[in-house]
């Protein structure tokens, strides 16, 4: 099968789109992507359901900045899951079905969340360190919603600048196969891809790896590990209960281990494969399948982050439970009030009132007749029978 990209040669030919049967390894890869996509939608929707009401709720002990970062993680994940649907469609049909603009948008959303998610986790670890270990002024500043939005906007702008090659070198590539010169027909297959010049690709991957992998990993480990040391030092100088201090230390250590393990397992293969592509050409089917599953690992980590932060934070769960209880109580009071108003409205209807009065009058009449009838019966039962009188008594 001959492949060529000479578009001018086949410009006026009849293009026949190549339809690849949905079978083989593409079936397993697409099924895996669809499964993780569904799980990602469910998990992020649940986290949004828990976190979003707390973002503007008063008197919440959890820092608003952390709530905002978790909210931003979920929104970014949902956008990435929507973009993943385009990749699934390409896997099913075997060719890209959309325009070049949609292709660029897909690659931007895909790359943006892969860079933004580690940075947001980096900011969360910094916020936890600031609120626990730094002085009160800086801790309160780091916990504010305004400060979190400013930091997020700076990180977002940095990522957009970093992604300029994706804007410049993303396009839909058309491959021409099996040309028929007699009928002037050619089979075409389209693929959405990011293919910059080799030098730009190398420096882009290197800078992206440092800024969105190495630096966040170092920051997450450093700031989270600093918290238990600070708590331990404070326990030695203050009268803090050992049980509560041990619980806090266990919680921090669990968070650090989970984040680090997920981060290393999901992101290390991804960045290794990005640089390995310059050495090995992916032609074997097994290598292509492995690359698809490696590409899936960052999606898994992005889904895991908001779930970990929500489940391990007791303050978020208790605050959400309180809001849900208040909403149920408010709904119950509204229901009771509506029922009371309906009953009042029914009582004030004139026709209903007259019928009710007539019913009461009729009931009273029946009761009076019944009472009179019972009294007469009792009086008659108290008198002797006429047949029992002697004859001499009759006058």
From Swiss-Prot:
Transmembrane segments: 38-58, 66-86, 89-109, 148-168, 202-222, 252-272, 287-307
Matches recorded under Gene3D superfamilies: Rhodopsin 7-helix transmembrane proteins (1.20.1070.10)
Single GO term (MF): G protein-coupled receptor activity
Function: Not known. Putative receptor.
Taxonomic classification: Eukaryota, Metazoa, Ecdysozoa, Nematoda, Chromadorea
Protein name according to UniProt: Probable G-protein coupled receptor npr-29
One Gene Ontology cellular component annotation held by this UniProt entry: plasma membrane
One GO biological process term: G protein-coupled receptor signaling pathway
Keywords carried by this UniProt record: Cell membrane, G-protein coupled receptor, Glycoprotein, Membrane, Receptor, Transducer, Transmembrane, Transmembrane helix
Family: Belongs to the G-protein coupled receptor 1 family.
Glycosylation sites: 180
PROSITE patterns, per the entry: G_PROTEIN_RECEP_F1_2 (PS50262)
Membrane topology: Multi-pass membrane protein
Subcellular locations according to the entry: Cell membrane
Protein's organism: Caenorhabditis elegans
Superkingdom of source: Eukaryota
A matching Pfam family: 7tm_1
């Amino acid at each position: 099968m001959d492949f060529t990209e000479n578009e001018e040669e086949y410009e006026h030919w009849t293009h026949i789109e190549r339809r690849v049967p949905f079978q083989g390894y593409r079936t397993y890869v697409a099924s895996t992507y669809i499964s993780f996509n569904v799980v990602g939608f469910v998990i992020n929707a649940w986290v949004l359901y828990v976190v979003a009401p707390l973002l503007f709720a008063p008197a919440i002990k959890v820092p608003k900045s952390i709530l905002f970062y978790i909210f931003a993680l979920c929104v970014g994940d949902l956008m990435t899951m929507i973009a993943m649907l385009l990749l699934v469609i390409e896997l099913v049909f075997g060719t890209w079905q959309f325009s070049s603009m949609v292709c660029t948008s897909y690659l931007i959303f895909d790359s943006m969340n892969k860079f933004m998610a580690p940075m947001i986790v980096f900011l969360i670890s910094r916020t936890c360190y600031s609120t626990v270990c730094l002085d009160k002024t800086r801790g309160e500043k780091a916990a504010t919603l305004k400060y979190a939005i400013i930091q997020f906007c700076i990180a977002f702008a940095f990522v957009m600048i970093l992604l300029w090659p994706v804007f410049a070198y993303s396009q839909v590539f058309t491959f021409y196969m099996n040309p028929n010169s007699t009928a002037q027909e050619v089979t075409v297959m389209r693929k959405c891809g990011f293919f910059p010049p080799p030098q730009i690709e190398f420096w882009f991957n290197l800078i992206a790896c440092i800024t969105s992998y190495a630096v966040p990993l170092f920051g997450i480990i450093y700031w989270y590990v600093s918290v238990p040391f600070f708590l331990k030092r404070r326990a030695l100088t203050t009268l803090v209960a050992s049980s509560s201090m041990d619980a806090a230390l266990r919680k921090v250590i669990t968070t650090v281990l989970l984040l680090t393990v997920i981060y290393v397992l999901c992101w290390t293969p991804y960045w290794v494969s990005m640089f390995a592509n310059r050495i090995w050409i992916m032609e074997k089917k097994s290598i292509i399948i492995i690359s698809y599953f490696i590409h899936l690992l960052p999606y898994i980590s992005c889904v895991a982050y908001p779930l970990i932060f929500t489940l391990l934070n007791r303050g978020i769960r208790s605050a959400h439970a309180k809001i849900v209880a208040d909403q149920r109580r408010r709904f119950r009071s509204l229901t009771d009030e509506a029922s009371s108003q309906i009953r009042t409205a029914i009582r004030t209807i004139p026709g209903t009132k007259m019928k009710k009065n007539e019913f009461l009058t009729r009931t009273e009449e029946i009761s009076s007749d019944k009472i009179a009838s019972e009294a007469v019966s009792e009086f008659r039962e108290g008198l002797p029978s006429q047949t029992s009188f002697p004859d001499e008594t009759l006058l």
